[in-house]
Amino acid sequence: LVPESIKMLVKSGFEVLIQSNAGLSSYFDDASFTDAGAQIISDSKTLYSSADVLLKVNAPSAEEIGWMKPGAILISFMFAATNPGLVDACVKQGISAFSMDAIPRISRAQKMDVLSSQANLAGYKAVIIGAAALGKIFPLLMTAAGTIKPSKVVIMGAGVAGLQAIATAKRLGAIVEVSDIRPETKEQVESLGGKFITVEGDSSIKVEGGYVKGVSEDFLKKQQEVITKHVSEADLVITTALIPGRKAPVLITEEMVQIGRAHV
């Protein structure tokens, strides 16, 4: 919650409690929340046990769920499919949990699509952090003393995070190559100035709601063979591929890292 949202909730009759220093990473100090009508609570356990509705970004721990009072509502990321223990803890405590990462990517739910908004930021920040850590500059630089070639960035996955990473890397002047197992993303990648790494198609690829639901092992092996050359020549590799409800696929193997450039 930001102070402006708190003002609306208070006006509607809600009592809003904010954990002390909760907004520091977003440049909101405690005073900005109290000015908006919220109460600052220093003790986390007291905050959790007092809430009828608890709003949180990252998934709570099982211990934190145990602090909540029975019948309370939890709204946060849960990643329930890969964190069944959290679901069990909510059931045991009598908590009604709304997993924001499970909201479908449809037009009616766009205003609640927090997964995409976070992925957008992650794609942008990944490039910025990578550029800062890289031992060379991104753009082509021509001077009287010589020419510095542009950096090459390889991005795995052309979803929300991947597309933002492409746009950011291109704006910084890098050469961008992108791999995604969904053929329909080729046009999106090229519209942002990226080069699409083509892998022969696989009729067994299943896509639902913009996400890949299944792909054969043979295709994944073929994809790794194709991208190995691109990764070995890259200055920066960013992986964004994600399968909802399952562990993110391992696309960059240790072997690829070993044959790649030392500074990748």
Ranges and model annotations:
Residues 1-89, 93:
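An N-terminal-biased, well-structured beta-alpha scaffold segment characteristic
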Residues 54, 74, 195-196, 237:
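Short, well-ordered beta-strand core segments
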Residues 1-28, 139-230:
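Glycine-rich phosphate/diphosphate-binding loop of Rossmann-like nucleotide-binding domains
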Residues 21-23, 45, 59-60, 79-80, ...:
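Short, ordered loop/turn segments at secondary-structure junctions
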